[in-house]
Amino acid sequence: MSSTAHPTNLAPSGNGSAACVHCHRRKVRCDARLVGLPCSNCRSAGKTDCQIHEKKKKLAVRSILDPVPIRCRPPNPEEAPKPISSLSPSSEPPNAFTTALRAVQSDITAPSGVANRVAHIRSRSSQYDTKGTRSNNNSGNNTQYQNVLPEPDSPPYSRPAASDPSEGESRADIEKRLVNLIDGEASDSRAIQRGVRAIYVGHELSNMSFLIRQQRDTGDDVYHFAGNEIPRRQLRTGHDQLLMDALTLPEPALADELVHAYFAQVNPGYPIVEEELFMSQYRNRDPADAPPILLLQTILLVGAHVTRPKSERDTLKDIFFRRAKWLFDNRIERNRDILVQAALLLTWHSDLADDDVSANAHYWIGIAARIATGLGMHRNPVCSRFVPRDRRMWRRLWYILVQFDVMVSLSYGRPQALNLEDSDVSPLTFSDFEGCGARVQADFVIHFSELCTMISYIVRERFGLRISAERRKAALLEADEALANWSLRLPDRLRLRASDMDPWSAMLHLTYNNFLILLHRPHPRASAYSDDYGPHDAEICSAAAGVIASIFEELRIHDRLKQVWYSGVHTLFTAMIQVRVELRFSNPVLAINALRRFDSASYSLRELAQYWSHASTILRLFEESRRLQEDLRTTTSDRPRRFSNLSNNSTNSPASQQKNTSGIPHLANINSSDATPPSAPSIPPLQPSSQLSYEVPTTESAHHNPRSQPTLSAHTHTYTTQPFDTWIPSNNLTPMDTVDNSREMLDWRQLFSFTDLEGPVLPSTMEGITELEDEWRQIYWQETPMSDLLQDGGWMHG
């Protein structure tokens, strides 16, 4: 029996439509609201279980462009933690970041809610279009950066507890991996089995590759060694908590401090972010025009690197990195320009030293390079219909990416991610820095871009795998002359100075002198390229190492090591290898002077280890290797010396010299104690015909600049397609049979330009230069100061 009475529990629908479960399933029109239950269709079908279909309740979702306001966790009366601020620094780990998002706590235990929110976030278009310009449909962006009072009944989100003590032991083992590799007796015979991490020591320019290849003069090209076991990590943060954690911001006072620190200490030299645009968005607190959350999290990370003490720095950087990486990996930000900016800023995060391939700066530069070339940043945007602001930003980002790519390539001896032969981006000009703030270092960025571009071409011509021996030898001559011309043309504010060196000119000369050592130090195998060197390699490497050690000492004294980027650690590593060779000189004066440099460099490396985790592994290498310590003791002992007349005058001074914590002499006294210095010869002025045109080879410059197309002789016509030649004047492309004579004409002191040329700041000529040069090479080739610690592996190709 069926009832035709209208049910009393059927409320009229807002749109006048409702369906029973059967009609909803069949997707047919239902008249249950009009005739009651059962509906006409169910009565005709004889179904008695006719019921109104109830729609499932939709979870409240919010876009990343329309988040809820951020609030603080209610204070715990038992713990009463102190907030982190610039006014009240705390040595305890920061806990001001345990904030939560209001109105989403009900979804914490429901992973599907998070999935729905993420799907909705991805479906929403970004507030920026693909060119970085503002779109018009962003009125719903209600992002706020002030904290609001929490609801009393809402459960807060708290970070996981601190890690277990075993992680500290694992970190110590990771930092000692280089020591274990060095002191191990059979590191080259260990099989790379499953579960064991392979170590690629790099190629040619890598310091670890250079050290490992010294011991035996064999032909086996081994580049991979067995490392430690692959560590196992557990995810301490649940997947359902990652989204709300990534959208969390710190207290306004701390956020303001970190943002200001970034734009005051980092962005002037690496203008990745347009300061005026970002700060206007950040200060206005306009919900319709808020700064991108991904970019803000990465800026907070870099700001924490340069401001907070170590007790807070590591924790803060881990928090900001976790949030930024989640936002990056889940493609929350749809503007690809911001992805390039974020990837470059994430290079300031120092992950654990157990992985320098899929983490740290090398990894993020590779990602930034892929995105940038995918966007077409490597092509000249002049003729494109770009907004001028975006055109300037693209050029800046491209050349900063070139800088980072070259520096990381020199650090690890790995191929560069960018090939400048495929780029025709016009050189930077001062107009490209409009909107970057009054503190921007335009001179530094322009000249540093020139240096890194030149290094990129030199590395390919000097160290390329398929470069002929003749071309390789000629490239050394051309590189020296190009570098000397570039150095002599630096403006006075960027030249080397004896004291008070700003961090930007310091970074410029650290990279420059690091490359001089890599370019001129001998090959670790005596039989390979034994004639491929110049007559002044020892002086150049020694002077460059002294400059590097002095710059780091100057930065350490003025508390500016925090502004040194990732590659600075490897630059100091290069200098310490050279200084360690000098520790074995038979001349005691030179050995003691090298000991001063080594002590100063060790102090700087210890300070850098406070900021960069990979510096700790190098520090352990020099501090805990038993064989390295034995060589250091030998330097201060009364061992037989070749120069007996100098030995008697200096054997009673090493102990007192070693206690001197002032480190090495300043730049004004480089090598002044090596021997009786004659008057430094004056630098001959460059002739107008030999001036370099430091213009990046582009399609425009090839047609409009006749000097960029050198006239080659018959002996060098096969190299006309090499892009490096466009950086070298035509008279530098000397025929192969006159390379040695031409090299003698270049004064090696031209490679070192100082501000005050009237003082004794240039490296002076050392006594017995011929004997010193021979001894220097013999130490590299025969005594091998570090090869007795390391196993062989094939440092270079065949």
From Swiss-Prot:
GO terms for cellular component: nucleus. It is found in: Nucleus. The keyword Phosphoprotein does not apply. One of its GO terms (molecular function) is zinc ion binding. Residues 82-94, 133-147 have a biased composition (Low complexity). Residues 20-50 bind DNA. It comes from the Eukaryota. Residues 632-641 have a biased composition (Basic and acidic residues). Residues 644-663 have a biased composition (Polar residues). InterPro entries: Amide_Lactam_Regulators (IPR052073), Transcription_factor_dom_fun (IPR007219), Zn2-C6_fun-type_DNA-bd_sf (IPR036864), Zn2Cys6_DnaBD (IPR001138). Keywords: Activator, DNA-binding, Metal-binding, Nucleus, Transcription, Transcription regulation, Zinc. GO terms for biological process: DNA-templated transcription; fatty acid catabolic process; positive regulation of transcription by RNA polymerase II. The keyword Transcription regulation applies. Residues 68-96, 115-172, 632-714 are annotated as: Disordered. Residues 678-687 have a biased composition (Pro residues). Its main location: nucleus. Positively regulates the expression of 5 genes involved in the catabolism of certain amides (amdS), omega amino acids (gatA and gabA), and lactams (lamA and lamB) in the presence of omega amino acid inducers. This is Acetamidase regulatory protein.
